[in-house]
């Protein structure tokens, strides 16, 4: 499925979505600036405590993974060179790569420092087929920044994202329009965008181990296990159905399109219950601010800062934009729990809702167990009570016995 650079590829007709993902970004930038480490196992993160932010492919070959506790990573790869993240260098490379994207197309949706979606439908006449554009991008990024990236080319965002994973490292995978199911169905069910550890466990208990298994399971069975909204969403993705478009990120002159909040604990904590409760409080705060701005957002981002001041973020893009506290919190807590940080000492947590749009233009599906507009109406009732009586008037029961950090 990988076309050669500069070649015509009839298989990419209709495949206007590119997902571009830098390869082992933090580690690649570190090695770029330390040529003596080329080809060696490198881990980026805290020296002793904290977690792995990134690992070179040589370190990954022995099992080192992002978000793994550093003590375990050192046991797996004692020969690895451990380096702290150079956020100034990372930000500079990320900005330069974004400028490369914008010379290709203005329709760029940035997901993080090291990945983005591009809609190249308007660039075909000028630059060639999507597969050719993907090769041009890779060549420019390698020439200008001395790092590699992988590109998935497909008709939809979901398939393009999965294709870029298959392309790693330093490759291009094209999934021809109409051949999505042949690509998707052999994949592990956990590969589906939106399937976290908890959902994957539920699916495996049903004997659903591949995307194809899920696709061929009757919806009523999936609904009983996952609820109506998630089951329908995953069933659509399993059949290659994804109507989400590439949403351009803001330019430098445009207003901020996210709202967030974070909290520093008075003492570092390794108690997941304390972290989850704080995520609930922050989710309520962020969602309230979003509603006050008459907005809604599609991407929930969680920030975790460890005792050694290393920081990681994890994001998930929802099917529909939301301003609902319960949805923000559920996603934020899932992102945190999926990291498995039970023994890591945490100094700060944050929640951010990104990709904001006018709430009047946003649509949303109901959550599992939610009556029509239930959570939305409940949030607005809380907002009215807070406006009238103050923020202490309405507090989630879970927070009543919580010792606030700071």
Predicted regions and their residues:
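Short Gly/Ser/Thr- and Asp/Glu-enriched loop/turn motifs at secondary-structure junctions
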Residues: 111-115, 154-157, 295-299, 344-348
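Preference for bulky hydrophobic residues occupying beta-strand positions
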Residues: 20, 118, 151, 302-304, ...
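Short, compositionally biased low-complexity segments
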Residues: 68-76, 106-113, 209, 247-259, ...
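Short, hydrophobic beta-strand segments
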Residues: 116-122, 313-316, 358, 363-366
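Acidic, metal-coordinating catalytic segment for phosphate/diphosphate chemistry
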Residues: 320-406
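Short, charged/polar surface micro-motifs in flexible loops or helix N-caps
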Residues: 25, 49-51, 307-311, 356-359
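Gly/Gly-Pro- and Ser/Thr-rich, intrinsically disordered tail segments characteristic of DNA damage-repair
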Residues: 1-234, 288, 372-406
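DNA-contacting surface of Y-family translesion DNA polymerases
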Residues: 10, 184, 191, 199-346
């Amino acid at each position: 499925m990988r076309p050669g650079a500069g070649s015509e590829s009839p298989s990419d007709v209709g495949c206007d979505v590119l997902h571009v993902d830098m390869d082992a970004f933090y580690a690649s930038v570190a090695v770029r600036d330390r040529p003596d480490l080329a080809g060696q196992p490198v881990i980026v993160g805290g020296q002793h405590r904290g977690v792995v932010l990134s690992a070179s492919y040589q370190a990954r070959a022995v099992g080192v993974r992002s978000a793994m506790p550093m003590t375990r990573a050192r046991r797996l790869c004692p020969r690895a060179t451990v380096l702290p993240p150079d956020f100034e260098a990372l930000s500079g490379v990320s900005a330069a790569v974004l400028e490369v994207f914008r010379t290709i197309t203005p329709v760029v949706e940035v997901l993080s420092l090291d990945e983005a979606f591009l809609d190249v439908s308007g660039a075909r006449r000028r630059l060639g087929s999507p597969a050719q554009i993907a090769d041009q991008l890779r060549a420019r990024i390698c020439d200008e920044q001395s790092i590699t990236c992988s590109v998935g080319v497909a008709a939809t965002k979901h398939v393009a994202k999965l294709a870029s994973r298959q392309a790693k490292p330093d490759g291009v995978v094209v999934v021809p329009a109409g051949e999505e199911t042949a690509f998707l169905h052999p994949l592990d069910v956990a590969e589906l965008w939106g399937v976290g550890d908890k959902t994957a466990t539920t699916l495996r208990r049903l004997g659903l181990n591949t995307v194809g298994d899920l696709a061929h399971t009757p919806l009523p069975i999936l609904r009983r296990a996952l609820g109506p909204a998630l089951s329908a969403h995953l069933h659509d993705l399993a059949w290659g159905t994804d109507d989400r478009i590439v949403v351009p990120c803001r330019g430098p002159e445009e207003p901020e399109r996210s709202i967030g909040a974070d909290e520093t604990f008075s003492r570092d904590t390794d108690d997941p219950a304390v972290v989850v409760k704080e995520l609930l409080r922050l989710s309520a705060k962020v969602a309230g601010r979003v509603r006050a701005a008459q907005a809604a957002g599609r991407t929930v981002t969680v920030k975790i800062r460890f005792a050694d001041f290393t920081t990681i973020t994890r994001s998930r893009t929802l099917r529909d934009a939301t301003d609902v506290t319960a949805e923000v919190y559920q996603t934020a807590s899932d992102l945190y729990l999926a990291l498995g940080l039970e023994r890591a000492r945490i100094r700060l947590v944050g929640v951010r809702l990104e990709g904001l749009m006018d709430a009047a233009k946003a649509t949303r599906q109901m959550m599992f167990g939610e009556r029509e507009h239930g959570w939305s109406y409940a949030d607005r009732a809380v907002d009215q009570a807070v406006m009238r009586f103050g923020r202490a008037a309405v507090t989630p029961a879970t927070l009543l016995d919580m010792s606030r950090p700071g």
